[in-house]
Design a protein with these regions (language model features):
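Sec-dependent bacterial lipoprotein signal peptides
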Residues: 1-19
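Generic secretory/membrane-interface signal
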Residues: 13-17, 21, 281, 336
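Membrane-proximal, proline-rich intrinsically disordered regions
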Residues: 21-74, 80, 92, 111, ...
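General helical structural elements
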Residues: 6-10, 28, 134, 218
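Structured, solvent-exposed acidic/aromatic patches
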Residues: 37-41, 74-365
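Residues that line or immediately flank small-molecule/substrate-binding pockets and catalytic motifs
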Residues: 8, 12, 51, 297
Length: 365
C-alpha cells in the first residue's frame, strides 16, 4: 500500500512540475528581440540599400571592381594579380554580382509578400525594389530566375532574358500606378518614413523613379526587342506620376551612419582612383563638370590637373597610385540612383528612334 501511495505521490508531483514548466512555455521559448509580425516598412530599408550598394564590401566587389570596366573608375590594388582590370578575376568574384542581390533581396521580400498577401502599396514597393536590383543582374548575366521565384523553392526555372525584362517592366509599371494613387488618395502620406533613405517615404518620388527606370530598361532592350521597348517608353513618359526631370527630383541614396563606400575605398583603403579614360575625354572637351566629379592630382608637378589612372597594368605598385585623382566624394556624400540628366538623355535617344517620348532631340540633349 505504501508503495502505491508513494508512486501516486511522485506522479502527482511530476504532473505539477510539468504544469509549472509549460505555463510559460511560449514566453521562455520566444526571442523577445526578434520581429515576429513582419512590419513591411521596417523590412524595406535594407532592400532599398541594395539598389546602389551602400555596404562597403558589396560596393567594392560589384560597383567598383566590375564597374572599372566602364572606364569611370580604376582600382588601385592588384590583389596579387587577381582582378577585373587584367581579366583575371576569380570565379568567386565573377559570382558576386549574382549572389549578393539574391541573398539580400529575397529574405525580406518573402516576408513582405506573406505579410501583405501579395497586395497593396507595400507589396508593389517591394516588387519595384526587386525589379531595380535585378535589372543589373539581368544586364550582367542574361537569363535568370525571376517570375517563378517563390519562398521555399530550392529549384527554380530560369526565365528567358525577354521574360525577365518584360516582368521587370511590368513590376515597375504597377508600382508607378499603385504608389502614385496611394500618394494622391492619402494626401501625401509617407508610410515608410525614416525607413526610406532616398525620398523619406514620399511615394510620389518613387513613382517618378519607377517611370524613369522604365525608360532605362526600354533603351537597354531597344536593339533586341524594339516593340516592347517603344511601348514601355511611351507609357512611362505619359504616366500621370511623371518622371525625374529636375535635380530636385533626383533619387539620391543616403548612406546614413555608414561612410560613402567610394570615399572609403579611395581615401581610407587607397584602393580606388579615377580612370584615365573618363579624364582624357573630359579634358579634351573642356568639360566644366570635372570639379564636381574628381579631386585634383597630388602628383609632383601636376597638382593643378586631373590625372586619371590607366587600367590593365599588371605590374604597378599600390604606392605608385597614391597621387592620382580620386572621386570627389566625402564620407557623407549620397549615392546617385537616378538623375534628371539621364531622363533627358533617354528621351533624346528615344526621339532618335522615332518614339513619341516628348521633348525635341536638341532640347533633350
Amino acid at each position: 500500500m505504501r508503495k502505491y501511495l508513494r508512486n501516486i505521490t511522485v506522479g502527482a508531483a511530476l504532473l505539477l512540475l510539468a504544469g509549472s514548466c509549460t505555463d510559460k512555455f511560449e514566453e521562455y521559448n520566444t526571442n523577445q528581440y526578434q520581429i515576429h509580425d513582419a512590419d513591411p516598412a521596417t523590412l524595406m530599408k535594407s532592400m532599398i540599400e541594395t539598389i546602389v550598394n551602400i555596404q562597403q564590401n558589396d560596393s567594392q566587389m560589384q560597383d567598383q571592381m566590375v564597374g572599372q570596366l566602364g572606364g569611370y573608375l580604376c582600382c588601385s590594388n592588384t590583389w596579387s594579380g587577381t582582378n577585373f582590370s587584367t581579366f583575371n578575376q576569380s570565379d568567386d568574384w565573377n559570382a558576386t554580382p549574382w549572389n549578393t542581390p539574391f541573398e539580400k533581396i529575397y529574405g525580406n521580400f518573402f516576408q513582405i509578400q506573406e505579410a501583405t498577401n501579395s497586395t497593396g502599396h507595400y507589396y508593389a514597393f517591394a516588387c519595384m525594389i526587386r525589379a531595380i536590383t535585378m535589372l543589373r543582374v539581368a544586364d550582367c548575366y542574361g537569363p535568370m530566375p525571376y517570375s517563378q521565384v517563390k519562398k521555399g523553392n530550392f529549384y527554380v526555372s530560369y526565365d528567358t532574358q525577354e521574360q525577365v525584362y518584360t516582368s521587370i517592366l511590368s513590376d515597375l509599371a504597377n508600382a508607378a500606378d499603385v504608389l502614385y494613387n496611394y500618394y494622391v488618395e492619402t494626401n501625401g502620406n509617407a508610410p515608410l518614413g525614416a525607413n526610406d533613405p532616398v525620398f523619406d517615404g514620399n511615394y510620389s518620388g518613387w513613382a517618378k523613379l519607377a517611370n524613369s527606370m522604365r525608360l532605362r530598361v526600354a533603351m537597354r532592350i531597344s536593339g533586341t526587342w524594339p516593340g516592347i521597348a517603344q511601348e514601355a517608353a511611351e507609357a512611362a513618359v505619359t504616366h500621370k506620376a511623371g518622371l525625374i526631370e529636375s535635380n530636385s527630383d533626383n533619387a539620391m541614396l543616403s548612406c546614413g551612419t555608414q561612410s560613402n563606400p567610394y570615399q572609403l575605398a579611395a581615401v581610407s583603403w587607397g584602393d580606388l582612383r579615377v580612370n584615365a579614360n573618363i579624364v582624357d575625354y573630359m579634358n579634351a572637351y573642356g568639360d566644366p563638370r570635372m570639379p564636381k566629379f574628381f579631386n585634383k592630382s597630388t602628383l609632383a608637378g601636376k597638382t593643378d590637373k586631373y590625372v586619371g589612372m590607366r587600367t590593365g597594368d599588371a605590374d604597378f605598385k599600390k604606392a605608385d597610385a597614391a597621387g592620382f585623382s580620386i572621386p570627389a566624394y566625402t564620407a557623407t556624400s549620397k549615392l546617385m540612383v537616378f538623375c534628371a540628366a539621364e531622363t533627358a538623355f533617354l528621351r533624346a535617344e528615344g526621339k532618335l528612334r522615332g518614339w513619341n517620348v516628348g521633348s525635341k532631340k536638341a532640347k533633350a540633349y
